[in-house]
Amino acid sequence: VRDLREYDAEISKALEIIGQENHNQVLLAGHSTGGLITTLYAAHYPDHRLVKALWANSPFYDFFKSIIEKKVGIPLLSEFGKRFPNAKFPSGLNPWYVPSLHKKFHGEWEFNLEWKPESMPFVQLCFVHAIHEAQKEIHKGITLNIPTLIMHSHQSKYPKKWGIDAQQSDVILDVKDMTNNAKKMKGDIQTLSVHNGLHDLVLSAPPVREKVYQDLFAWLEQKMP
């Protein structure tokens, strides 16, 4: 992908079909990159007749990097990505995330490892560019006119070996970036920390994901009765 706005047409078409099936309200939801995409969609289409609330599950509002890397390295890679979109660069993603999920390793879930491989050592620079451009809009502050719930783990870690941190933390993104960028947003915005949550909160350990759903449904009862 070279521009996250490429997804807008697909989301709009899906909402059109949902409306044709006589549904009158939708909770727009997205995880990680999807959380970034859906947040911006809600900002860009503030008067959509179906979208009544937004749930962002550990949204990708910034890269899990140092301040220097964010201010210098990422913009430079983004610029290279505009010129050399297919070039690859080390992703820096923690190698223990997928093993914490998949039943083949240490997790409880079954999914296609060709689609979501055990590790992703490299990333195309066009992806870095697309994400960076979208994040710049988030960082400036956006307005959301629908109730928004941003949920994330209570902590981020970058474990170098398998252990408890990989099972009870967000090892992909920095949760502080989520809360800091949420504070820049205008509207009915709520952030919620989930103790021992994984990056994808609904794939966390059973007691944790049960709490995720309890909190989400309690919020929905207030915002989308």
Go through each PLM region and give its residues.
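Alpha/beta-hydrolase active-site loop
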Residues: 1-19
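Short beta-strand/loop motif that positions the catalytic acidic residue
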Residues: 150-152
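Conserved loop-alpha-helix segment in the C-terminal half of the alpha/beta-hydrolase fold
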Residues: 154-193
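Alpha/beta-hydrolase-fold enzymes
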Residues: 29, 33, 37-123
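Active-site nucleophile elbow and catalytic-triad environment of alpha/beta-hydrolase enzymes
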Residues: 122-141
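Catalytic active-site module of serine/aspartate enzymes centered on a nucleophile-bearing elbow/loop
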Residues: 188-225
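Alpha/beta-hydrolase fold nucleophile elbow
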Residues: 20-32
